[in-house]
Amino acid sequence: MAVGKNKRLSKGKKGIKKKVVDPFSRKDWYDIKAPSIFDVRNVGKTLVNRSQGLKNANDSLKGRIIEVSLGDLNKEEEQSFRKIKLRVDEVQGKNCLTNFHGMDFTSDKLRSLVRKWQTLIEAHVDVKTTDGYLLRLFAIGFTKRRPTQVRKTTYAQSSQVREIRKKMFEIMTREATNCDLKELVQKFVPEAIGREIEKASRSIYPLQNVYVRKAKILKAPKFDVSKLMELHGESTDETGTKIAKDFKEPEVLESV
């Protein structure tokens, strides 16, 4: 008799299915908190696997990038064409504390700005804020008709484009290097930098629709929890207050 596996005996019962485990049963929901510079603090929720063994849930959450519309953050529909990127830097309990990580325009807004019969002028520059953030700012602008112009086209000469681009470099560098990241983000919303560029280039060639269309963080300083908590409007003063206690030192005994 040949010795070997009996295939008939080794086969299991047909029709028995594996027990399906819901993957969401091993996950937890965490709240995403935006910095205090925005009106809406609760941005949304994010999922992460529970801490198990050497794997910590907090480590999986840190570094996550969340993209949110500025219209949702400030409850203003007019600002919905700006996309704000937030990065999770700290986890406290079930809250993910975020910091500004970048800004961009929606593609439909950019396409709506580009038209015929005008010159598009773009510039980008690397700037460093007072708190040590290295950013790359991208500016965009379009030529417009002069008040007394009859001609349909508003094309600028290459020499004028170079001059306007130079003004863009100077203004973006000046505005960004004299403030910290929080103040710079607040300048994006009312388009203060764009208005400055428009005003400065009026003598060269009149511009319209001037925006800082994109901001990208290239390098961030060493992470500091106290600064992040300050950005979220929470105190991190760990120095305790001295409490007066009714304590009397016992008298020294002369003999025992």
From Swiss-Prot:
Subcellular location: Cytoplasm
Main location: cytoplasm
Keywords: Acetylation, Cytoplasm, Ribonucleoprotein, Ribosomal protein
Key word Ribonucleoprotein present: yes
GO molecular function, one term: structural constituent of ribosome
Subunit structure: Component of the small ribosomal subunit. Mature ribosomes consist of a small (40S) and a large (60S) subunit. The 40S subunit contains about 33 different proteins and 1 molecule of RNA (18S). The 60S subunit contains about 49 different proteins and 3 molecules of RNA (25S, 5.8S and 5S).
InterPro entries in the record: Ribosomal_eS1 (IPR001593), Ribosomal_eS1_CS (IPR018281), Ribosomal_eS1_euk (IPR027500)
Cellular component terms (Gene Ontology): cytosolic small ribosomal subunit
Protein name: Small ribosomal subunit protein eS1
UniProt key word Cytoplasm: yes
N-acetylalanine sites (modified residues): 2
Any one of the GO BP annotations: translation
Family: Belongs to the eukaryotic ribosomal protein eS1 family.
The gene coding this protein: RPS1
